[in-house]
Curated annotation (Swiss-Prot):
This is Acetyl esterase. It comes from the Bacteria. Not essential for cell growth. GO terms for cellular component: cytoplasm. The gene is aes.
Length: 319
């Protein structure tokens, strides 16, 4: 699609979203568009520091978790000693960027609003790790904490998965992996999915939306996919194209959040319509005027804070 035919997104977004887009960090170097992935990761971490400031203070603990691929770092956020459940958080970043620091505020707010223990899993990024390594690391971490729940004083009788963007795909894929392979890590009470991608290769929103402002042009999406997958056949795997999985039975309750001007919005709409058509418990909420990744900006955006509260409320309602 010719770029000129796309929607004038930056003219259409909400006033608070425009404020975020126009917020400058004078001490930040330019985005290393032609740099290495390592340089882009470093920039992303630096850029997110401003947006992570002022998050709620709470007890935090770090553990290295053994997996067949090696040790994976995890971080526990404990808002209270008697947590009713444990939420595993998977960060976004196109499978190639992001870590526990870039999504620190999101995890802290989710823990605060849900009053549940939140465990961030620093899964190995691509292209160093190829599908399905990240999912297997996440599942290994769930199993580890389930086995060590008493020693670590966490409630693993009821768990959930949450994630944004690529992390949302990993969250739902991990829940389906546990179901399909009959792995017991506690009851999966809910899955919280903010503006994820779930397997569409083309859509109306992918045509109309996406640009330099969100890093989600068709070329960008192809680059993330090529970094993540091992081969072309993986595109049809039921743990990458989740619409190739069985979404008609035993899907945990899903909170599906969409951003109005996100090229991935149709992924969320299709997921919701599929689950709803088969009487699987789910809720869809569209956040008007927002861009992909708006969840990061709760320091400045009431809508981002609202989206986190909505997800937390949905999860606690399942307990």
């Amino acid at each position: 699609m010719k770029p000129e035919n796309k929607l004038p997104v930056l003219d259409l977004i909400s006033a608070e979203m425009k404020t975020v887009v126009n917020t400058l960090q004078p001490d930040l170097p330019p985005w290393p568009a032609t740099g290495t992935i390592a340089e882009q990761r470093q920039y992303y971490t630096l850029e997110r520091r401003f947006w992570n400031a002022g998050a709620p203070e709470m007890a935090t603990r770090a553990y290295m978790v053994p997996t067949k691929y090696g040790q994976v770092e995890t971080r526990l956020f404990c808002p209270q000693p008697d947590s009713p459940a444990t939420l595993f958080y998977l960060h976004g970043g196109g499978f190639i960027l992001g870590n526990l620091d870039t999504h620190d505020r999101i995890m802290r707010l989710l823990a605060s609003y849900s009053q549940c223990t939140v465990i961030g899993i620093d899964y190995t990024l691509s292209p160093e790790a190829r599908f399905p390594q990240a999912i297997e690391e996440i599942v290994a971490a769930c199993c580890y904490f389930h086995q060590q729940a008493e020693d670590y004083q966490i409630n693993m009788s009821r768990i959930g998965f949450a994630g944004d963007s690529a992390g949302a795909m990993l969250a739902l894929a991990s829940a389906l992996w546990l179901r399909d392979k009959q792995i017991d890590c506690g009851k999966v009470a809910g899955v919280l999915l903010w503006y994820g991608l779930y397997g569409l290769r083309d859509s109306v929103t992918r045509r109309l939306l996406g640009g330099v402002w969100d890093g989600l042009t068709q070329q960008d999406l192809q680059m993330y996919e090529e970094a993540y997958l091992s081969n072309d056949a993986d595109r049809e795997s039921p743990y990458y194209c989740l619409f190739n999985n069985d979404l008609t039975r035993e899907v945990p309750p899903c909170f599906i959040a969409g951003a109005e001007f996100d090229p991935l919005l149709d992924d969320s709409r299709l997921l919701y319509q599929t689950l709803a058509a088969h009487q699987q418990p789910c809720e869809f909420k569209l956040y008007p005027g927002t861009l992909h990744a708006f969840l990061h900006y709760s320091r400045m955006m009431k809508t981002a804070d609202e989206a986190l509260r909505d997800g937390a409320q949905f999860f606690t309602a399942q307990l």
